[in-house]
Amino acid sequence: MSSVFITGSSSIKDLPNDVITSLENIIDKGFEIFVGDAKGVDTLIQQYFYKRNYTNINICTIYETPRYLASNKFKIIQVDYDKNLFGEREKQTYKDEFMTLNSNYSFVIWDGKSKGSFENIKRAIISNKKLKVFYTLENRFLEKELLNIENITNLYKQNTGYTQTEIYNKIKESKIYTNINKANEIKKWLIDNDILKIYNDKLSINQKYKNYFIVENYRGNENIKYKANSAKLKSAQQSI
């Protein structure tokens, strides 16, 4: 019997119509399903199959009781993990690895930003699993030729940005701005060249360069990440 691991981003609130069509195909083919117990896509998938009275489903959890369970007719699989771990994401990785390795297919419904879904896509590729990715930012399935580590990583970074260390490594690889010798010199260089500004101890972006950055708000604090690829970095340098 074929099996599919269905997963996706916790930010997603509704299942797109094309995803529902795929779920109906899964029901028609009688696939065994592996799905987690998180909010977002996990919950939506459980609810959908419950409403469709489809019970060939394994709910995988690292806990004795799943965080979410739509139906008592679903089978529960408790996945063991390294008890020395403290981080929730690291613990949950054991569950995701189990579902990837025990299924023939991975079906990921991704917002382009979720790191957990990003890792599940990469794991499916590395494990040579059949893979289908629905990209909600463009409301479409990604073409098969895009489903490789390089393209998926570029797409993820396009949406989430690069850290200061990551952009420094890209700068050194491209041999642009060779006067920058340390990652922590990037911020000073950007301020000196009027790309970033400091006003009342708060960092802001010169609107001329706003497309090169991503501003994240986390618990009231703004964090600036770098969106530039090598071509954009070169363009920014030439425009100064």
Model-inferred region functions:
Residues 2-10, 35-36:
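Short, hydrophobic/glycine-enriched beta-strand segments
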Residues 1-5, 96-109, 162-170:
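Long, low-complexity, intrinsically disordered polar/charged segments
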Residues 132-163, 173:
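Phosphate/pyrophosphate-recognition segments in soluble nucleotide-handling domains
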Residues 1-2, 145-149, 235-240:
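Short, Lys/Arg-enriched, disordered terminal segments
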Residues 153-166, 170-177, 184-187, 191-240:
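Positively charged, aromatic-accented nucleic-acid-binding surfaces
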Residues 12-147:
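Acidic/glycine-enriched connector segments
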